[in-house]
Amino acid sequence: MPVLEALLPKILSVRRIPGADPALLRAYGADPERHRSLGLVTVDQDDPTYVALDEATKHARVDVVYARSFYAGSRHASGPLSGEILGVIASDDPEEIESGLEVIVRTLEHDACFYAANDDGSIAVFPHVIASLGTYLSVAAGLSPGEPMAYLVAPPVEATIGLDAALKAAEVRLARAFPPPTETNFAAAYLAGELHQVEAAAMAFAEAVVQVGRHPRER
């Protein structure tokens, strides 16, 4: 497997609830006064799904009301459709749910994914750049909709070395860090700055992760 070959996410389920029970809406973070319908997805990669959910908010009148990674990742899933994450979008209009789900699927199939950081793909890296944030990840990062952001993820030591390299390689600031362990035992960070700067930071992050994989005990 070539280094930095795409590891495409697998979409495991896409379902709609056009008229959800108010109790269910409330339980999953929706507001029955504003939301009537839900769209649900499960995927075997969590971070690309967070990106896809955010993308949906830019193209459809939907809110991301629930999105959680599952403990220990997709290799330890509770069932064949569980994957690594459940994401839920909500709207008052079933057609908006449909539009949002279409964006989510398209983003997962053609945009956001992990990459192999070594020859056998046992180390994965997510050096993703969002040119314009939607309403979901902007809140999570403490940024404004429309701002660029680098969304960086890797295993613990690789991510730590990579984040240091990214911060030194470009004029970016650390908007939020997720030290290990996360639910999936990775580590992550959001970096803010001008688009070309976050792109440079993401590239430096990926390169550093690859180098750590090649030389894990370098002095």
Q: Where are the language model's segments positioned?
A:
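A structural signal for small-residue-enriched, beta-sheet-centric alpha/beta enzyme cores
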Residues: P2-Q45, R68-I85, S91-D92, A112-R219
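Tubulin/FtsZ superfamily GTPase core signature
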Residues: H59-R68, S99, V105, L174, ...
